[in-house]
Swiss-Prot record:
Start and end residues of each stretch annotated as Disordered: 112-132
Superkingdom of the organism of origin: Bacteria
Function: Forms part of the ribosomal stalk which helps the ribosome interact with GTP-bound translation factors. Is thus essential for accurate translation.
InterPro entries: Ribosomal_bL12, Ribosomal_bL12_C, Ribosomal_bL12_C/ClpS-like, Ribosomal_bL12_oligo, Ribosomal_bL12_oligo_N_sf
Species annotation: Leifsonia xyli subsp. xyli (strain CTCB07)
Family, per entry: Belongs to the bacterial ribosomal protein bL12 family.
Gene name for this UniProt entry: rplL
GO MF annotations, alphabetized: mRNA binding; structural constituent of ribosome
Name of the molecule in the record: Large ribosomal subunit protein bL12
């Protein structure tokens, strides 16, 4: 097999969809027994807070979110597919498969503003969204 340069690899990755890239990363991690996750950062322990207050604080402090499409109103499925395509730049077939496979992750690692915007758009189109 010919050795590919970094630039050639990047060009090949540009042609892949987000789903294909995600599958590639998983295979890469398994093959080389590595992880693409950032190393954990030590944080000073905060005093324990009770129940929902702690969950709300965690959500406020969190800086990246996964947008999960939990379910779709059957009568608004087409609008949800259009929004998924607009948010992810997936093709029609991939977006339809993602919507049909709910619950499924639409976006991973989005910042708070992007996550809120995506949630608003998808809920407006007829989807039930959960931010994780």
């Amino acid at each position: 097999m010919a050795k590919l340069s970094t630039d050639e690899l990047l060009e090949a990755f540009k042609d892949l969809t987000l789903i294909e890239l995600s599958e590639f990363v998983k295979k890469f991690e398994e093959t080389f027994e590595v992880t693409a996750a950032a190393p954990p950062v030590a944080v000073a322990a905060a005093p324990a807070a009770g129940g929902a207050g702690a969950a709300a604080e965690d959500a406020e402090q969190k800086d990246s979110f996964d947008i999960v499409l939990e379910s779709v109103d059957a009568s608004k499925k087409i609008q949800v597919i259009k929004e998924v395509r607009a948010l992810t730049s997936l093709g029609l077939g991939e977006a339809k498969a993602l919507v049909d496979g709910a619950p499924s992750t639409v976006l991973e690692g989005a910042n708070k503003e992007a996550a809120d915007k995506a949630k608003t758009q998808l809920e407006g189109a007829g989807g039930t969204i959960n931010l994780k």
